[in-house]
Amino acid sequence: MIGCDCVVCRSPDPRDNRLRSSIYVQTPECSWVVDTGTDFRTQALRENIRTVDAVIFTHSHTDHIMGFDDLRRFSHVRGSMPVYASVETMHDLERVFQFAFKTLDPFPWYLKPEPHVIDGSFELGGTLITPLPVPHGDSIVNGYLFSRGGEKLVAYLSDCSAVPDEIAREISQVKALIIDALRDKPHPTHLSVKQALEVAARVKPEATYFTHISHELPQAAEARLQASARIGYDGLRLSF
């Protein structure tokens, strides 16, 4: 947090140094990123990301879209960049990044989005991607379920203030639940640690990882969670 001297902001544990929430998915067929926050360029350089074949957006808040233009390098390499988003999020992307979405673009080095409005499940390579609409305060945003060969691998719910029963049933017994857990105290647009654990108890995943964590939740708090969940950190890698 800018200008903050709290315990987490002064922590020597590198896992307490958190950038904006995002995930990079790599499969034998292709790779994609979910959300391009303000820190996307820093994250891509740090993790040595060399290919991005598509981008999927959860919603259009600035902490999830403002690194969009840094996809131009990957777009230039492959000729265009498939963009998957809800109709509302796509509209906001087109408004904020008008220069990129222009039909006639005189600058060949610009990012060239290839818009795909999400209206149901879709596939990237051999992965089935199912949108999971969840409330984020007064808004509805998308989480995603990633499945391969009929197996539910990852449910990604980075921003939510509740998880409806039908969504919990859809992702039941997923291998990994990555879920919003902002802090211990309740928040109007994000889940608290207690609420996230309650969702996990309903979903019964093999493993639970917290994301979108504020500076009010230190990495050291993972000790009190015991085996129920892990606090995610920048650079965490999961393999299936």
What is the predicted function of each stretch?
Residues 39, 61, 161, 182, ...:
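Catalytic metal-binding/acid-base residues of hydrolase active sites
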Residues 14, 37, 160, 186-193:
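A conditional alpha-helix N-cap/helix-loop micro-motif detector
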Residues 49, 134, 160, 181, ...:
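Hydrophobic pocket-lining residues within nucleotide cofactor-binding pockets
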Residues 1-157, 166, 223-239:
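Binuclear metal-dependent hydrolase catalytic cores
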Residues 164-240:
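Binuclear metal-ion centers of metallo-dependent hydrolases, dominated by the metallo-beta-lactamase
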